[in-house]
Regions:
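Soluble non-cytosolic domains of exported or imported proteins
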Residues: 20-27, 98, 146-150, 197-198
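Structural recognition of the beta-strand scaffold that forms the well-ordered cores
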Residues: 7, 15-17, 41-44, 59-60, ...
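Active-site metal-binding motif and surrounding structural segment of the metallo-beta-lactamase
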Residues: 13, 23-65, 162
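Accessory terminal helices/loops
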Residues: 161-166, 173-229
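Active-site environment of divalent metal-dependent phosphoester hydrolases
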Residues: 2, 23-25, 45-52, 65-68, ...
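Conserved beta-strand hairpin/beta-sheet module of binuclear metal-dependent hydrolase folds
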Residues: 1-33, 120-134
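Metallo-beta-lactamase
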Residues: 21-22, 67-184, 188-190
Length: 229
């Protein structure tokens, strides 16, 4: 799996967004960062990997803590632990600072926290960027039913309205607002295809016909399970 970690640096001080979760990556990234002062880590959707920089202050919303400790994030951690075995660091970061919606400054860098259903997104005004969990303009996403699709659409439309130059995600290369518009169209189409499908298998077949070149078949499998639970 591709898990992205972002390092926002200003004047020799850095803030980490998300944590790596494989032991070898934990060590490699810690070595890479050894000459920087790390002011803190924002732990949103990827709570595993607690052996990575355990001494650094950890920031998260209350719902993100619940997501990683007992919610959908915990279920994913358990699944990854079973799939990857001893190479996967399933320990969950202990959050030292519970944060809420709105602006917060860490290490001299301003962030704006936007709470989502599972955890939170992070706006970074100084570089006109936003971090969210998943986008992927040519990749399936995990969509937990029509209401979740609508929530993602509203979220992405908000980013388009705000005019962000860069959208950073955990599972894809950096993208832009054209990619957000593409994902909105995809989500609208998913809802239509689900409404006209008799079951999960029909739905997956219809989506694959519409988007034959999309990656992330495992995400589509999960989405089908949510739409036809």
């Amino acid at each position: 799996i591709d898990n992205e970690v972002f390092i926002v640096e200003k004047d020799g001080v850095a803030v980490i967004i998300e944590s790596p979760c494989f032991f070898d990556n934990n060590q490699e990234l810690a070595e890479y960062l050894q000459d920087l002062e790390i002011a803190g880590m924002l732990v949103a959707y990827h709570g595993a990997g607690a052996t990575f920089m355990p001494e650094v202050a950890k920031y998260a919303t209350a719902n993100a803590v619940a997501y990683s400790q007992s919610g959908g994030g915990k279920a994913l951690i358990d699944n990854f632990s079973n799939a990857f075995g001893a190479s996967f660091d399933s320990s969950v970061h202990q959050i030292t600072h519970i944060i809420g919606e709105g602006p917060i400054t860490i290490g001299g860098i301003e962030f704006i926290i936007r709470q989502t259903a599972d955890a939170f997104d992070i706006e970074i005004p100084q570089i006109n960027a936003v971090y969210t969990h998943m986008l992927g303009h040519d990749c399936h996403s995990i969509v937990a039913g029509p209401a979740h699709a609508d929530a993602i659409i509203a979220q992405l439309q908000g980013y388009i309205t705000q005019g962000y130059d860069l959208i950073l995600t955990s599972h894809y290369t950096p993208e832009d607002l054209k990619d957000a518009a593409t994902k909105i169209a995809y989500l609208e189409e998913l809802k239509k295809l689900a409404a006209h499908s008799a079951n999960a298998e029909d739905f997956k077949a219809a989506v694959n016909r519409q988007y034959p070149d999309y990656s992330g078949a495992n995400y589509l499998e999960m989405t089908a399970g949510f739409f036809f639970a």
